[in-house]
Regions:
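Glycine-rich, acidic/polar active-site loops that bind/position phosphate-bearing ligands
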Residues: 1-469
Length: 469
């Protein structure tokens, strides 16, 4: 554990002129407060900094707004994008009066989830491996007004630009619909920017493995190596920040929206998960696909609570434009070895250490701390109550008829449905106080505002379908 004096020395030795206090709001957006280096001392690092919590959506009311940003001294990293040398540090949120962890702090929830596994005796380490996909565009415009609503995206890779007149000429090399996985350049025009993504993410302290073009034009993925749950929550925040900043430096813009384009694949965030104890993987065994009973029960918990999990793993109205048949989205709550159409997949591994469960329905609009913690709690409920997931489904689920699909459990069809599901199925989350009822109620209220916003807004497709009726 890093001491206050060690952290202060590291800050001064780094040459940083500023300390950027980073924290995550309920929706998963990274926020920050920058301190001048001349005021950074042991007292600040030990006691934190007061701030106005009422300005953060879903947190405290203005009459009880004081909160504390408490630095986690083990999480310092230099920001490679600032003009002046700046050190970033992750912060936890404390109540200003009690100095206790604030129960709506997402990072605090992730910490409690890890502690729950340890205190249960079922394991001591939770490993997470997220695969966050994203799009990179050249230009994006959108507006939502009383009398007009529209968006327009543009990318040189877009098949809609095959006849466009460019000043330098239209060279023609671009992936078609569902054609991005994965030809070499010049069809793949993003080799250099993806390499730069990887380099800067390594500069941010992340352990990177690979990069590649994804299925849709302008869509990409960077391989982030697995780590413990809390560290991967931090890692996804660094990942998103790095992608946004590098894209900006190239004069482009990146988005983690699940479905920004019509008629092609959306962006998911498949999450690989495993539990270990005493240095041994608990998911390896001699059952189906080399799984242990513990792993099967973990899957059982994920499937049982799948609809409630959607509130955290797929927390945007846009999420459910991705979770539809026909675009490689896993909408059926079953499990399988190798079968990528299942919502829970067992990846091939030659080693027991690599035995894990891949949950495929999450997307990168998720708050990583809440999503990872919620899936862990669902899996732990499955282990605790020995919830068996039933037989595996090794057939291509995309080929099933509507009547066959109707007999199988599926993910939610809308954010409203997901919020209603977690409202009714929350006991597994509140076990040992990992999540609290107040936290879940506040989350539902906040996300329902997004539901209302969409449901109360006329859509251009409605004009196309109904204006002349």
């Amino acid at each position: 554990m890093t001491t206050v004096s060690e952290a202060l020395k590291a800050f001064r030795d780094s040459g940083a002129k500023y300390l950027d206090l980073r924290f995550t709001d309920v929706k998963g957006k990274w926020q920050h407060l920058t301190m001048d280096g001349t005021v950074v001392d042991e007292d600040l690092l030990n006691n934190g900094v007061f701030f106005d919590g009422s300005s953060i959506a879903g947190w405290k009311a203005i009459n009880e707004s004081d909160m504390v940003l408490k630095p986690d001294l083990s999480t310092t990293v230099m920001d490679p994008f600032t003009a002046q040398p700046t050190m970033m540090i992750f912060c936890d949120i404390l109540d200003a009066v009690t100095k206790e962890p604030y129960e709506r702090d997402p990072r605090g929830t992730a910490k409690k989830a890890e502690e729950y596994v340890k205190s249960s005796g079922m394991g001591d380490t939770v490993y997470i491996g997220p695969e966050a996909e994203f799009f990179v565009f050249d230009d994006v415009k959108f507006q939502v007004e009383m009398n007009k609503s529209s968006f327009e995206i543009d990318s040189a890779e877009g098949p809609y630009n095959s006849a466009k007149n460019y000043e330098s000429g239209n060279l023609g090399h671009r992936p078609g619909i569902k054609g991005g996985y994965f030809p070499v350049p010049p069809v793949d025009s993003a080799q250099d920017i993806r390499t730069e993504f990887l380099e800067e993410l390594k500069n941010l302290g992340l352990r990177m493995e690979k990069h590649h073009h994804e299925v849709a034009p302008s869509q990409h993925e960077l391989g982030l190596l697995f780590d413990t749950l809390l560290k991967q929550g931090d890692g996804i925040q660094l990942y998103k920040y790095g992608v946004h900043m590098v894209a900006n430096s190239f004069g482009k813009t990146a988005t983690f929206m699940p479905k920004p384009v019509k008629g092609d694949n959306g962006s998911g965030m498949h999450v690989h998960q495993s539990i270990w104890k005493d240095g041994k993987p608990l998911f390896a065994g001699d059952g189906y696909a080399g799984l242990s009973e513990t792993a099967l029960h973990y899957i059982g918990g994920i499937i049982k609570h799948g609809k409630a999990l959607n509130a955290f793993t797929n927390p945007s109205t846009n999420s459910y434009k991705r979770l539809i048949p026909g675009f490689e989205a896993p909408v059926i709550l079953v499990y399988s070895a190798r079968n990528r159409s299942a919502s829970c997949r067992i990846p091939v591994s030659d080693s027991p250490k690599g035995k894990r469960v891949e949950v495929r329905f999450p997307d990168p609009t998720a708050n990583p701390y809440l999503a990872f913690a919620a899936m862990l709690m669902a899996g732990m409920d499955g282990i605790k109550n020995k919830i068996h997931p039933g037989d595996a489904s090794d057939q291509d689920l995309y080929e099933l008829s509507d009547s066959e699909v109707a007999k199988l459990p599926t993910v939610c069809g809308s954010l409203r449905e997901a919020l209603e599901a977690v409202d009714q199925d929350r006991a597994f989350l509140t076990e040992a106080g990992v999540f609290t009822d107040d936290q879940i109620d506040g989350y539902i209220d906040l996300k329902m505002q997004e539901v209302y916003d969409l449901e109360h807004s006329p859509h251009p497709v409605e004009f196309k379908n109904y204006f002349s009726v």
